Amino acid sequence: MFSYFRKSQQKVEENQNGGGGDGRGSGIKVELQTNINSRDLKNEHSDPKFKFSPLRSTDVHLEDYDNEKYKLKFIQIVTRHGRRTPESNRTPLTMWMCNSMDHLISNKDSPRPNCNPGQLTVLGIVDQINVGKIYRKLFIDHLGFLDSQYNKDQIFIRSTNTTRTISSARSLMHGLYGGSFTDEQEKSPHHSSFLVKPDNEENMYPRNSKKLVFLKNLIKQHPKVIKENQLSELEKFTEKINKIFENSKPEESSFRARGFRSYAGLVNSFDCFRNNGLPIPKGLTKDIIQRMYEESAKEFKSARYFPEMSILGIGRFVDDLNKELKLKARNDPSVKDLKLSLYSGHDTTLAALLVGYDMYEDKIHPVTSSTLEFLLMQDKDYKEPEVVKITKSIEKELINHQYVKVIYNHKPIHIGPCKDKEVDGMCPLSEFLKISQSIIPTNYDEQSKLTQLDKKRYLSLIED
């Protein structure tokens, strides 16, 4: 049984004066696991000053999910996995602490197994358990939206085919239906009950079709990107970071990324060290780190200059989400009991959705354990027709009384093309479905092809 974590005194407190001070009402109280027993977890590689804490806000506001006018009908949650090890083995992976997949929640491994590249760390597991505990307080204890015991008919779970996303889904579900990280009995559903698509069908993150690869490279030459980078003196900032890596001594930090090709890649590698308690080069100050995250977000956001990047990158997953959402909206018998769908993905999953819907309001790269929620809300005073068969007219009536609210890391965000049509901060479902259609490919295989005419057309766009 794990002895690594004790219950923390850190809580998401109920605030009688309006939650987290933003005037959005009371938050919910959740006891998170944050204290580290340094004797058990830290090793000779760890930063002695490191203290484990959540990487983003855990303050949840009840009125975002249920109020006097609207009720929650269904929710889709898309997550980024928890803290992980680097995907390369340039640094000895013995520096990180991991569990085996067989003993993910309750540690029965003796001796502790070596980590694999890109694997969820012990801290990553705790991250996801904490996310699950927050959702338990919200959906079970406060709203009574989900049954207190796991009901497979109420919850659908899908993960990409990587150990870190599968482990993240299992850990989140353990927090939702289990307890603490020290439980011997894992109470979450086993990963064999998740939907994991074969690699050739996976669409939860951008796949490298010929056209998408071409556009990814071309976007760096887009006049707006070049101008923005010039105004921010990005080249000078990049040189500064490379100089820090050049001057960093091996005994100071094992983290090296000199000559990095993208800020998204840099941030992902950096997170593996800093967020797992390993030392980083001294020259990387808080201001520099903050800008690294901002530059990564700018890279993701640049995809908006070529809408095809969203269509090819995340459009098929948007189609999956929308088909499910529409079935629930029209009360299809196949999803009668379904209340929550969990999709365990990556930073590129979240970033692509945020860009595709023009709702990337945050200034930084999606941190590990981030959550993006699509809430299907319905008018509380609307009485659904009691019919056996849903006709087109009844479907339209149902849809007209439903809305989509989007919440990113427990903060409502807004879909760009829907801002002038919002109702109480939500996008009418009919509008949401229209906007989604603009992101969904009509024929992915054909649209992924890259002809010489395509190349000329795109090159002419950046030359104008």
Swiss-Prot record:
Q: Which domain of life is it from?
A: Eukaryota
Q: What is its EC number?
A: 3.1.3.2
Protein family membership: Belongs to the histidine acid phosphatase family.
Query: Which portions of the chain have biased composition (kind: Gly residues)?
Result: 17-26
Keyword Ubl conjugation in the entry? The reply is: no
- Organism of derivation: Dictyostelium discoideum (Social amoeba)
Location of the region described as Disordered in the Swiss-Prot/TrEMBL record = 1-29, 180-202
Signal sequence: where?
none
Where, by residue number, is the active site? H81 (nucleophile), D347 (proton donor)
Which catalysed reactions does the entry list for this protein?
A: a phosphate monoester + H2O = an alcohol + phosphate
The protein's name: Probable acid phosphatase DDB_G0284753
Question: What would you give as a GO molecular function for this chain, any one?
Answer: acid phosphatase activity
Q: Which Pfam families match?
A: His_Phos_2 (PF00328)
Under InterPro entries, the record lists: Acid_Pase_AS (IPR033379), His_Pase_clade-2 (IPR000560), His_PPase_superfam (IPR029033), Histidine_acid_phosphatase (IPR050645)
Q: Which UniProt keywords apply?
A: Hydrolase
